[in-house]
Amino acid sequence: MALLQIAEPGQSAAPHQHRLAVGIDLGTTNSLVAAVRSGVPETLKDDKGRSILPSIVHYGEESLLVGHEARELAQQDPSNTIFSVKRMMGRSLADIQQRYPHLPYQFEASDNGLPQLMTPTGKVNPVQVSAEILKTLNARAVATLGGDLEGVVITVPAYFDDAQRAGTKDAAKLANLNVLRLLNEPTAAAIAYGLDSGQEGVIAVYDLGGGTFDISVLRLSKGVFEVLATGGDSALGGDDFDHLLADWIKEQAGYIGDLTAQQMRMVQDAATDAKIALTDADTAQIDVLNWQGIVTREQFNALIQPLVKKTLMSCRRAIKDSGIEISDTIETVMVGGSTRVPLVREMVGNYFGKEPLTSIDPDKVVAIGASIQADILVGNKPDSDMLLLDVIPLSLGIETMGGMIEKIIPRNTTIPVARAQEFTTFKDGQTAMSVHVVQGEREMVSDCRSLARFTLRGIPAMTAGAAHIRVTYQVDADGLLSVTAMEKSSNVQSSIQVKPSYGLSDNEVATMIRESMTHAQDDKDARTLAEQYVEADRVLEGLITALAIDGDTLLSKEERETLEGVMMELVQLRKGTDYRSIEQGIKKTDKASQEFASRRMDKSIRQALAGQSIDEV
């Protein structure tokens, strides 16, 4: 799915150059940046050898600190040390204060109700705070890779709405980053494990970070990730494990009453250190506020087990919402640093009935998947591994009456793109319409590639041509085509998704384009003939219906026989292949039926005006 320089198949674009691109996991608790180097995806480290950047920004009187340095000031200046800003992205101030009532920050609403945080350097909003994190990651990438970036792929939760995604893009813009794509975090994790290559089936992505829990159920089919269901808890994460352990420490130490913000931060840090130690050890030593003690893994497990069970309840709901059984999942991918906790891995494995995938560092797996996608999008993969998806390689259209194609999106249209066109019914009382999605450059369906079919049902019964069916073709940045058909008066609709490029090689694209040129005149003639067939059918269908209703009352016997004779001539011409003769037959039939049509119109007007006075008219 590389974004290539546009060139016709078989023609070379600009000479290949390695382009610098990275994947960024902009997380609630921690953020990372990764790149593919010498064919191997890896996270990029800072000058102290650290991959993880805490998603924390400290605003001081004369300085702005991001990451580890900002976290060090959290104890002494908590109100100006911004944690978990991702939770505020795209939300109103009222929403934030309702969801997170105990945040230590001073807020002020902007004119449009969005949150502004009061800092010593002035007011900042969540987008600006996120931009500082992105700037730091960008600087790390430039320093490590030795050049400016061509673009970035930034990951977002699958449930992020348009406002949250737009906020993420705005933050990247403030950081002077070119966003190639926003990639769903569960999809990035699946890509990191190579699940997008060759496998088909259902994948569960269990993402337990510091501040949030997300479960995503994905179906992988023909190279396309479809999100079947998402769930989780935006207020449950590894931080809650820390809080429980911190409360246990306070209880064991005999602390009574409220601690200061600085003391509470010290206890929290001690709890975090103990939790990390218990990942590999059975016991952990704690030394905080003049108290020393030991916590065992068994004690820690007893504290957090209710929370882990709560995540599994979310998993159960997501599985139910997706309409599958647990046994249908082929893999369970673990994401987020909190999935290192042994009890979490054990309970998740037992629930899904299989050992979860944990070979890639769960803190890094999303960033690694994003870096693989970024590397593809800037064109660093060998040509054999790419698909030309920056433009539509072949026209996308719909089959119309007569086996013809109406092109909706012409080839070489840049993506993402959305186009819509209106169609109507062919017969009186028609209540359903079959939508046949096709791909190719030829004029007839038989010479093009069939992509998908679906049926729009529930169209209100009307006379032929009265219904308005709007068909929308939308191709996203991944090359995924969504087709929606909607009847405008009733709003009934149906849709389908398809990957136009799947299973289509560059040679096949070239062949289809070449054949469209070779057969251009033949195709034009075939389409013209098909159009005359359809028009003849329309005229004959309309007259047959009209004669059945008004023929005996509005026409004399001789007039009816004359008209039916002309119609039979058209029926015979319709059996031939001379489109000019059919066209002349249609004109002759139209002329012969003009008087009948005029009488029908007069009758309709008289019926409409019956019983009304001149004033009412």
Curated annotation (Swiss-Prot):
GO terms for molecular function: ATP binding; ATP hydrolysis activity; ATP-dependent protein folding chaperone; unfolded protein binding. The keyword Protein transport does not apply. PROSITE patterns: HSP70_1, HSP70_2. Keywords: ATP-binding, Chaperone, Nucleotide-binding. The keyword Isomerase does not apply. One of its GO terms (biological process) is iron-sulfur cluster assembly. It holds the Pfam family HSP70. InterPro entries: ATPase_NBD, Heat_shock_70_CS, HscA_NBD, HSP70_C_sf, HSP70_peptide-bd_sf, Hsp_70_fam, ISC_FeS_clus_asmbl_HscA. HAMAP family: HscA (MF_00679). Belongs to the heat shock protein 70 family. Chaperone involved in the maturation of iron-sulfur cluster-containing proteins. Has a low intrinsic ATPase activity which is markedly stimulated by HscB. This is Chaperone protein HscA homolog. It comes from Photobacterium profundum (strain SS9).
